[in-house]
Amino acid sequence: MEKSTWTTKVGLAQMLKGGVIMDVVTPEQARIAEEAGAVAVMALERVPADIRAQGGVARMSDPELILAIKQAVTIPVMAKARIGHFVEAQVLEAIGVDYIDESEVLTPADEEHHINKHKFRVPFVCGCRNLGEALRRVAEGAAMLRTKGEAGTGNVVEAVRHARAVYSEIRRLQSMNEDELFTYAKQIQAPYELVKQVATEGKLPVVNFAAGGIATPADAALLMQLGVDGIFVGSGIFKSGDPVKRARAIVEATTHYNDPEIIAEVSKGLGEAMVGINIDQIPADQLMARRGW
């Protein structure tokens, strides 16, 4: 039963492949995202840039806001729960969200355990920085992965680092024999069966999107060319000068990621991009990507 349920959830996430998922904080923003071609929206009270700027404890959004956003659009609605906070996840499932993001953008609720995602009917998306993190999350029941990046910075460097790390590790696996795979599984603290599956198939068992710091159409196309299956855009759209135009442009660039002429065309006259932050200027205790284990 559990296996078939997980397979169904993975199939649901596959339906988002090649698309853009946008962070929204109001029903109006959700409508803009849907009209721009987003395949789903992430309902939030504050985008990551505001969470980063305002500090404090970041928790699950008010269910009333999530329901208002659900009523405003016909595309799937995601919402974030804190790492390890299975009751926030239970609440999100109870109000009918389509996907739950167990997210390092919120303040972690548990410093040892992630949520056991097999206990839920709703598919989960989780962040990863490398293959070990990716496969640990899949073992816990994640139906979809994303790079962690460094959310709320408008700086794509961490998302690139995480995507490259995952795909280079997959390529390494493919040249290993069974003995080496056993040892490697122990080194990256991932279940051997999953490691072996990835080595055999040459790909992750679930879709892997890029997230964290994507601010321009070129950023989105860069990650797609690196091999991700789709794009999450957080603060990059509604913290920019012309959100409607930028949202459409990022969708176009994600669809036509191998066509520089189209990317050039949609990148024209987008107005001011969000103000970015250099990663090395962020104090270590404020780096979101390090949250999770």
From Swiss-Prot:
Disulfide bonds: none annotated. D-ribose 5-phosphate binds at D23, G152, G213, G234, S235. The gene is pdxS. Keywords: Lyase, Pyridoxal phosphate, Schiff base. NCBIfam families: PRK04180.1, pyridoxal 5'-phosphate synthase lyase subunit PdxS. This is Pyridoxal 5'-phosphate synthase subunit PdxS. Signal peptide: none annotated. In the presence of PdxT, forms a dodecamer of heterodimers.
